[in-house]
């Protein structure tokens, strides 16, 4: 792969990953409510899902998925429903105090955080269309596809994980301030509203 090709790809990925979305908000809110470790687990769940989408798109399977109206709608409606559910949970949340959890509860929480991140990361079917359209612009058919995949995927993972970690740390750093009287409730209302809005917007998405 030529250096200029990688630079152009990196710029495209930088713009993509720097744009805040549901996964960023989820890591932020998890950092506020549960601390850095669970927020990082959430980030890894989201990263796993998006990396799978990237892989499917790179191998050409993304074209098959993106061309199926049925599959697109299934992903869309499941993702929208889950985002709206997260919003409702945020509205109902009363996280005004913390308590220590035993190891079993912590283990369960990490599993739940990973699954939550994975679902949100995979909730937008347009990601498949985006990557499917992106890769042909940069793939060199005369070079090793495996090497190119490793470079493309590695670059994406570094940037995506960096941004999600940033939002997780931001949540941790602002948690004390947010959990002062009245602010936690406002934060829950704001995040709940954003999740619900994202779910509603996703439900109206189409493949075009």
Predicted segment positions?
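Short alpha-helical transmembrane interface motifs in multi-pass membrane proteins
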Residues: 7-12, 81-84, 115-119, 155-156
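Alpha-helical transmembrane segments of integral membrane proteins, especially early/N-terminal helices
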Residues: 37-46, 82, 111-123
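Hydrophobic/aromatic residues within the transmembrane alpha-helices of Major Facilitator Superfamily
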Residues: 14, 18, 51-52, 88, ...
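Core segments of transmembrane alpha-helices
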Residues: 120-132, 192-195
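Short loop-to-helix capping motifs
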Residues: 21, 35, 124-125, 180
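Cytosolic-biased juxtamembrane loops and peripheral soluble domains of multi-pass membrane proteins
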Residues: 91-120, 176-178
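Juxtamembrane transmembrane-helix termini in multi-pass membrane transport proteins
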Residues: 3-73, 131-152, 156-157, 168-169
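Selective transmembrane alpha-helices of multi-pass membrane proteins
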Residues: 67-98, 157-170, 175-208
């Amino acid at each position: 792969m030529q250096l200029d090709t990688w630079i152009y790809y990196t710029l495209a990925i930088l713009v993509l990953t720097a744009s805040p979305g549901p996964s960023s908000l989820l890591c932020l809110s998890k950092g506020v409510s549960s601390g850095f470790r669970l927020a990082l687990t959430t980030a890894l769940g989201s990263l796993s899902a998006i990396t799978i989408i990237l892989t499917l798109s790179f191998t050409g399977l993304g074209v098959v998925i993106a061309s199926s109206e049925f599959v697109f709608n299934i992903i869309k409606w499941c993702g929208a429903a889950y985002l709206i559910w997260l919003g409702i949970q945020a509205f109902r949340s009363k996280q005004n105090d913390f308590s220590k959890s035993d190891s079993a509860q912590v283990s369960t929480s990490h599993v739940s955080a990973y699954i939550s991140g994975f679902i949100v990361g995979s909730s937008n079917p347009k990601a498949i269309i985006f990557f499917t359209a992106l890769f042909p612009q940069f793939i060199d058919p005369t070079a090793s596809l495996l090497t190119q995949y490793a470079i493309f995927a590695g670059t994406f993972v570094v940037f995506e994980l960096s941004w999600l970690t940033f939002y997780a740390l931001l949540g941790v750093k602002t948690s004390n301030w947010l959990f002062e009287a009245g602010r936690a409730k406002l934060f829950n209302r704001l995040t709940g509203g954003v999740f619900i809005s994202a779910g509603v917007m996703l439900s109206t998405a189409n493949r075009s």
